[in-house]
Amino acid sequence: MNPRQGYSLSGYYTHPFQGYEHRQLRYQQPGPGSSPSSFLLKQIEFLKGQLPEAPVIGKQTPSLPPSLPGLRPRFPVLLASSTRGRQVDIRGVPRGVHLRSQGLQRGFQHPSPRGRSLPQRGVDCLSSHFQELSIYQDQEQRILKFLEELGEGKATTAHDLSGKLGTPKKEINRVLYSLAKKGKLQKEAGTPPLWKIAVSTQAWNQHSGVVRPDGHSQGAPNSDPSLEPEDRNSTSVSEDLLEPFIAVSAQAWNQHSGVVRPDSHSQGSPNSDPGLEPEDSNSTSALEDPLEFLDMAEIKEKICDYLFNVSDSSALNLAKNIGLTKARDINAVLIDMERQGDVYRQGTTPPIWHLTDKKRERMQIKRNTNSVPETAPAAIPETKRNAEFLTCNIPTSNASNNMVTTEKVENGQEPVIKLENRQEARPEPARLKPPVHYNGPSKAGYVDFENGQWATDDIPDDLNSIRAAPGEFRAIMEMPSFYSHGLPRCSPYKKLTECQLKNPISGLLEYAQFASQTCEFNMIEQSGPPHEPRFKFQVVINGREFPPAEAGSKKVAKQDAAMKAMTILLEEAKAKDSGKSEESSHYSTEKESEKTAESQTPTPSATSFFSGKSPVTTLLECMHKLGNSCEFRLLSKEGPAHEPKFQYCVAVGAQTFPSVSAPSKKVAKQMAAEEAMKALHGEATNSMASDNQPEGMISESLDNLESMMPNKVRKIGELVRYLNTNPVGGLLEYARSHGFAAEFKLVDQSGPPHEPKFVYQAKVGGRWFPAVCAHSKKQGKQEAADAALRVLIGENEKAERMGFTEVTPVTGASLRRTMLLLSRSPEAQPKTLPLTGSTFHDQIAMLSHRCFNTLTNSFQPSLLGRKILAAIIMKKDSEDMGVVVSLGTGNRCVKGDSLSLKGETVNDCHAEIISRRGFIRFLYSELMKYNSQTAKDSIFEPAKGGEKLQIKKTVSFHLYISTAPCGDGALFDKSCSDRAMESTESRHYPVFENPKQGKLRTKVENGEGTIPVESSDIVPTWDGIRLGERLRTMSCSDKILRWNVLGLQGALLTHFLQPIYLKSVTLGYLFSQGHLTRAICCRVTRDGSAFEDGLRHPFIVNHPKVGRVSIYDSKRQSGKTKETSVNWCLADGYDLEILDGTRGTVDGPRNELSRVSKKNIFLLFKKLCSFRYRRDLLRLSYGEAKKAARDYETAKNYFKKGLKDMGYGNWISKPQEEKNFYLCPV
């Protein structure tokens, strides 16, 4: 019959440090008269694996054969010879724990458990520690034994130890430093270092008398002398894990016999610690990880306490202040606390840790509670205190009054230790890492040492219920001190004040519980579409209803309702505390109930804000109708990752509305929109009431906020906004804001598959607009929308200017009459801008877009699509609104093969250049009208000297460009863009961040964008360009710079006029004050005023006022601009001219000569020369006439030389052959 697993009858065992074998195991069991010291040593030897069976007091029990059923020892240990490789089985040890002896590992065979719960907590702790045993042969014991044999005070080196023990020096060093870290060895300085036994260890071993170097037990008179010291010291069981059990057994024996410990306190003394040995105990000194000494909850509590006092700290500083040494010791704890929402970090290298607001509030409340004076608690019996420590059942003993006495306990009962005549309070014991408790039945039996019997399978009834340690009953059953009825309760007002600091819902529920009242949240109404619902909630406390609240989510609605209820309750509680009379409080209650009733049946003005729409949608629609831009600004983000808080506010222009906080961005935006709408509603109410309107009129006007907002002028804002957005979206917004329906219809489709043609037509409010033809459906819709927009907005603008109440269809004749009226009759111009609150730059942009839209609203579809607009506005005085005198669009340059030797092509069709050429034509027309009789109505006046004319001091010219000029003025990203602001300061702050900024740049031929000029001298030639050399045209930023030095008039008009400079420059998009001012004026004064001092009178360096539009913010539009270019000046009346920018001629099959070409402008110069009797200039060529203006020519050469000297590059001009054409004398 094979022996059952886990049992052996042979029991042979070879010790690694002993030359002989134990051929026979000693099964001497202590009888009733045996010494307790002998039993203690047997118990220790059994725990170390040196005995196969557990010793029992009081009865001799022979080793049981495996065939006997029923009774089994608690820890059947099978020890076999290591050379034979037999298995060692310890009952109760889980799988995965291995024995290690002489380098050979033997896995445990886990027996099938028979479910049995432990009878008491102390034994469960003992078994759980026993399950953590790891039996192995350690080099540490060999080294310690060798050093002990050397004698006290003697030391040796690692090299000698390696030779004596036959172990590699590397392994010896590792063990030596490990022992030194545990405090068992002492390292002496030297090379190589000397090692010896630590003084504290020797003193303890000699004083305690447990084990001497010779191997005899000092305090065991009945110890087994056959066991040599090597049998006991060179054990294969880990000392670190056995130490708690040795301490328990030693405690039991010392309590029984009164043996004095090294700390000079008797075990039975009042100051003794039954659960822990002195500080040199191996159970604590052997733990290398600092976290092993401390409970995780204790570490977290220390971290929270420290952060509560210092507000923030790094991980290293935290570790040092709570008793650790390195940051890595608490990094894992901090990360775990961050997940729980107790702390959060800022920064990365290294992070700074803070307490979260919620954790700080909880700690503050806890501290405030603890600070309340408590009644003296009842004295805790010593039995409860002692039950917190690990104990073993020991025999009863009647000793002196200061001895420990225990009652007889049965199997499965809790041992209760009675302490008699104890007057001194015992200090709080050091805390060990809590043992691991396994849920479920234990795999080890329980031994009744007093009765000397093995435990049976019978489970007592008292073990069938969950039991806690005696020390835990008080914490669970007794009511906390702050709920004690003996303590004075805080007032309702103070409680409400504390609850107000929390989440509104949590605070209200806490107050209701405090006041022993029921609190309910009732949903009254749900409205709105499924994608944007609206919820209305109401708080009911003990049947009392509070004002409801409405929001876009249930959570927010509950929070708002709770906040309203908290506000009302707080006011009532405050009134009671302030000592108001009952009548006043009753009156306030009635008043509040009336408000509640009113809130339950809200007026239409209160509900019309968000009827069927979300607050964000309603606010955006209202802002669209007002022509203002609306922005949701994220002010801050707080809180941990699992519970963030976002703070948002709404900004409309320069006005900012109150900010709100919410747990999500969507909810925060909705709440911010609600606040903005309420503020707007309040402003509208106040403004209407201030106009002395009847009360019925006010309520009727407030029935719908949207019906009030269109009363403000919005058409100008729509004009600027719609013309700078996607045409389809702009038309749909326009139609929706006016209550119309808009649609696009495919009228016709033709052409081959590789080149189809689609004819689209837009319909708005039942009215069809002109059809357009395109090569794709998308382009067709965009162009149809653009055409419809221009017709609609043009009609509205004309009606507004002329004071019409209704919009009438615009025909060619009416347009012609309107344009003539606007251009010739100053009385027809409005004196003030209809756009309330707009800035100066908004006025300039509005005039430019209005004029362009009026000219092109019924023009051909070739003008549709993305374009760049530039215009020059003239103001006759500071109060004059201004009039557009020239405008142009375009973004192309002529191709090299389209150059003309006769001046018949326009080389640069960019919007800024075209508007300036139109401005020159305007100046020619004004000069032709000038005479001494009509000088009062002219914009000119005689200059000093009388030979030339100059612009009157009150007349100013302003340039508007819908985007930044190409070249140096547009070389920045959008993050550098400046916001629009109305500033009276005209000082420039140019940006010079790197040497590349300020360089001259040329435009790309037949494309968009610019490239820098080369550093070498470049002289373009006619034949080179014709043969394929790249045609270079200076960028718009560089040309505007030249206008601010030499003037807008050019070389030819310098014969008759003084230089004319711009007063301001306004941009609609991509504006940066530092980059723009550097590009258009300030780069020539980078090194001071030396350049300006070299200019001859009347030329100066002009620094115009710069700014951007604020009533809209254009979005970036993808796709290339069209090749067409439009030019117009005030002298042309209603006549628009459309050019092909790549050819420089009029768009059409005949390639007609443009009116802004060199040839036509030179023709106007010839007419002016005849009119002013300058016959000397009539016979000159175009180039010669320009050079004849010597002052201008000198200033131009100086300007080009200055740019080169400053390192900006060479100015590149067109070939000279292009300027050598003549005209017949006029």
From Swiss-Prot:
GO molecular-function term, one example from the UniProt record: DNA binding
The keyword Acetylation is annotated on this UniProt entry: no
Keyword Phosphoprotein: yes
Phenotype upon changing R801A: Abolishes interaction with TNPO1, TNPO1-mediated nuclear import and nuclear location
Phenotypic consequence of I716N: Disrupts the bi-partite nuclear localization signal and abolishes nuclear location
Record-listed cross-link Glycyl lysine isopeptide (Lys-Gly) (interchain with G-Cter in SUMO1), residues: K418
Catalytic activity: adenosine in double-stranded RNA + H2O + H(+) = inosine in double-stranded RNA + NH4(+)
Region annotated Disordered, chain positions: 208-238, 258-286, 574-610
Positions with biased composition (Polar residues): 600-610
PANTHER family referenced in this protein's UniProt entry, alphabetically: DOUBLE-STRANDED RNA-SPECIFIC ADENOSINE DEAMINASE (PTHR10910:SF107), EUKARYOTE SPECIFIC DSRNA BINDING PROTEIN (PTHR10910)
Subunit structure: Homodimer. Homodimerization is essential for its catalytic activity. Isoform 5 can form heterodimers with ADARB1/ADAR2. Isoform 1 interacts with ILF2/NF45 and ILF3/NF90. Binding to ILF3/NF90 up-regulates ILF3-mediated gene expression. Isoform 1 and isoform 5 (via DRBM 3 domain) interact with TNPO1. Isoform 5 (via DRBM domains) interacts with XPO5. Isoform 1 and isoform 5 can interact with EIF2AK2/PKR and UPF1.
Protein name: Double-stranded RNA-specific adenosine deaminase
